[in-house]
Regions:
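General structural signal for secondary-structure boundaries
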Residues: 1, 36-38, 153-155, 167-172, ...
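P-loop NTPase motor domains
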Residues: 1-114, 184-188
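Generic structural signal of hydrophobic/aromatic residues within well-ordered alpha-helices
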Residues: 8, 15, 34-37, 161-162, ...
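Preference for short coil/turn "hinge" residues that link or interrupt alpha-helices
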Residues: 17, 30, 47, 92, ...
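Residue-level signal for secondary-structure boundary elements
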Residues: 20-27, 78, 152, 169-173, ...
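Conserved P-loop NTPase motor module
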Residues: 61, 180-221
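Broad hydrophobic/π-residue packing in well-ordered secondary structure
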Residues: 71-73, 97-99, 120-122, 147-154, ...
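Conserved ATP-driven motor cores of ASCE-family P-loop NTPases powering translocation/secretion/packaging/pilus
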Residues: 108, 114-200
Length: 221
């Protein structure tokens, strides 16, 4: 089992030392990396973890370590009465069924399901991205207060989305299936009715921002 886990995490032992093929894990460096990331989140910064070079198991391990450390620290702040001074933290997880699917939760809750259920008490939210809503337990879906519904051609998944929506979308099955790129329906406990929205293309938005941004002034004294 240990050898299997080492393979999945791309680590092995060489001359008694821990070696990582993708240079992510180390026995001598990075002792404050997770703490530094959490501190950045506490200061209101956006932190993006690039896991494109990692296998799924390593990616989920790193994400769980960061999310867990943040959650436990915010729990501590609440008990100390200083949580109100901290910014809200949102944890984004892609391919959410990997950690929120029924199969993943057979042996009990993990940090992601815990945040989904209890995070709001500690100013931590979960943004779960998935095309397969049907494999996520209804208990978890019920705790996600806002759903941004994109187009989906799979009838099973549309039914799961409609059943978990905060408003009655039973007559919107066809509308959901025909949503185009950039179009969505927002269903939330914070709105009285579902709201259709349109998102601009990210590349166009960035290019527009770059054109409008004035060059920085340099003053020599």
């Amino acid at each position: 089992v240990i050898e299997c886990q080492c393979f999945l995490l791309s680590v092995f032992i060489r001359n008694g030392d821990l070696v990582c093929r993708n240079q992510i894990f180390s026995s001598t460096a990075g002792t404050t990396t997770i703490s530094d990331i959490v501190k950045s989140l506490e200061s209101g910064k956006t932190v993006i973890i690039d896991t494109s070079r990692l296998m799924t198991q390593a990616e989920l391990l790193i994400g769980s370590m960061i999310a867990g450390n943040t959650f436990w620290r915010y729990q501590k702040y609440k008990s100390e009465g200083v949580l109100e001074d901290k910014p809200i933290v949102s944890v984004v997880i892609e391919e959410a069924p990997r950690v929120l699917g029924s199969d993943s939760l057979q042996s009990g809750d993990n940090i992601y399901s815990t945040i989904a259920k209890e995070g709001r008490k500690f100013k931590i939210g979960l943004i779960a991205i998935t095309q397969l809503t049907s494999v996520i337990p209804k208990e978890i879906l019920a705790n996600l207060n806002t759903k941004i519904i994109l187009g989906n051609e799979m009838a099973t998944e549309r039914r799961a989305v409609i059943e978990s929506a905060c408003q009655d979308l039973s007559s919107d099955d066809q509308a959901i299936s025909s949503l185009d790129i950039g179009e969505a329906i927002v269903s939330s406990t914070f709105t009285k009715f579902a709201v259709p929205v349109h998102f601009p293309k990210f590349d166009d938005l960035i290019n527009l921002d770059a054109k409008e941004k004035k060059p920085e002034k340099i003053i020599f004294r």
